A protein has these predicted regions:
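ABC ATPase nucleotide-binding domains
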Residues: 81-82, 92-192
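Helix-to-loop junction immediately C-terminal to a conserved catalytic motif
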Residues: 56
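ABC ATPase nucleotide-binding domain helices that frame the ATP-binding cleft
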Residues: 49-52, 148
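Conserved ABC transporter NBD signature motif
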Residues: 64-72
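The feature captures the beta-strand-to-loop junction immediately N-terminal to the Walker
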Residues: 41-43
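Conserved coupling/switch loops of ABC nucleotide-binding domains, chiefly the family-specific signature
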Residues: 62-65, 115
Length: 192
């Protein structure tokens, strides 16, 4: 009885997406409880990235509903969904320092310089990269770049964090360390 009344934080209902003749997703249905960490499993080309991009608002489904915190978000732009997204290739700006990469979303949101400085310093400490604020991505290891990508996604305080194979380009030892670190951060911050 209690489970039936439980409201999912994220729900996908009958999501369909095609690219020409290719069906990237077909009647996808699932829900995610608030504060939970889940993974989408499937072979290459099965539509996992497409689903994440639709939840984020970077692509629109052909049909179906995406519901976040009780609201249908199909027509809400990505910038208004309150979602952090970490891409497989990090997507860091190579000509921006660690500080500026992390601050990017906050500047877009037009936060005050004081707030940006405090928030970025807090995140740099959280990811364990104190003293590296002025380095560029090319001066960092793969694991450090990935932590900067996580910090950038977390900077605007998203309620939902989407990760698209964030550990694929990292060696096995660092991958395991980052997985443990990320799980701990997500629990600490209460992000879904």
């Amino acid at each position: 009885e209690e489970r039936r009344n439980y409201k999912m934080y994220v729900e996908l209902k009958n999501i369909n997406k095609t690219y020409g003749d290719y069906k990237a997703s077909s009647d996808v249905n699932f829900g995610i409880e608030k504060g939970k960490l889940i993974g989408l499993l499937g072979p290459s080309g099965s539509g996992k990235t497409t689903i994440l991009r639709m939840i984020a608002g970077l692509e629109n489904p052909d049909s179906g509903e995406i519901i976040i915190d009780g609201e249908v978000v199909n027509n809400i732009p990505a910038s208004k969904r309150g979602i952090g997204f970490v891409f497989q290739n990090y997507a860091l700006f190579r000509y921006m320092t660690v500080f500026d990469n992390i601050a990017f979303g906050l500047k877009i949101q037009k936060k005050s310089k004081k707030y940006i400085k405090e928030r970025v310093k807090e995140l740099i400490k959280l990811i364990g990269l104190e003293g590296l604020d002025n380095r560029y991505p090319s001066q960092l290891s793969g694991g450090q770049r990935q932590r900067v990508a996580f910090a950038r996604a977390l900077a605007p305080n998203p309620h939902l964090l989407l990760l698209d194979e964030p550990f694929a380009a990292i060696d096995a030892k660092v991958r395991q360390e980052l997985r443990s670190w990320l799980k701990e951060m997500i629990q600490k911050l209460g992000v879904t």
